[in-house]
Amino acid sequence: MLQCTITTRCAAAMAALLLLAAPAAAQGNSSPEPGHALEGAALVRALRGGGYTLYFRHTATDFSQHDRAMTGYAECATQRNLSDAGRAQARAIGEAIRALGLPVGEVIASPFCRTMETGRLMFGRAEPSTIVRGYEGTSPANADYARLIALLASPPAPGTLRMITSHGNPFRAVAGPPHLGEGEAAVLKPAGASFVVVARIRPGDWAGLAESEREK
């Protein structure tokens, strides 16, 4: 058991212990892993077979707005919301996914307005869950990402893809840098008690995936 008598030394020791206790995935890098990376037509074929989770950061937002104290997640006036460009972006990504014939299964969203709207515009539905946010409200003071890691490590229903629309910070916390851009998706493959990143798809990449299918 750690015992501390000097406040500054105690704080430093506790910080070190917290780093050691952090999820292993967060100590790495969320770029596609060598030996697992997929792109182009090979990525499309893999996604059509199901078995992956696509973790999206919400699409483009209006940064003149800010998250403030709120009484409930449906209180959109106190949150940063999608911009018109972000709404168009979400619709376009959803259309590309349908055009590629990808088997969309469950759609899970952080309960914030921007993430729920992203899911609904992409897929026509979204089930709110704080698991993909990692904590309640706007403060990460009590963040617990263990359930998010467990979700990402679990396979979706057979033959389907699990779609998540959430935020950049939770993904960085469990997978490491680089940070997801707005509208960017990480493609994750379950790997025992964790997961591996096999691809990252930026909003503008979907057209290239469709083109790779036509050229195969």
Segments the model singles out, each with a brief description of its role:
Residues M1-I6:
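N-terminal secretory signal peptides that target proteins for export/translocation
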Residues A11-A21:
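Bacterial N-terminal signal peptides
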Residues G51-T53, T160-S166:
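Generic beta-sheet signal
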Residues A22-A26:
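Sec/Tat signal peptide C-region and signal peptidase I cleavage site
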Residues V132-S139, Y145-A153:
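All-alpha RGS (Regulator of G-protein Signaling) helical domain and cognate RGS-like helical scaffolds
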Residues G28-T130, Y135-S139, P177-V196, R200-K216:
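Active-site-proximal alpha-helix that buttresses catalytic centers in soluble enzyme cores
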Residues S154-T160, P190-A193:
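A short, structured loop/turn motif at beta-sheet edges
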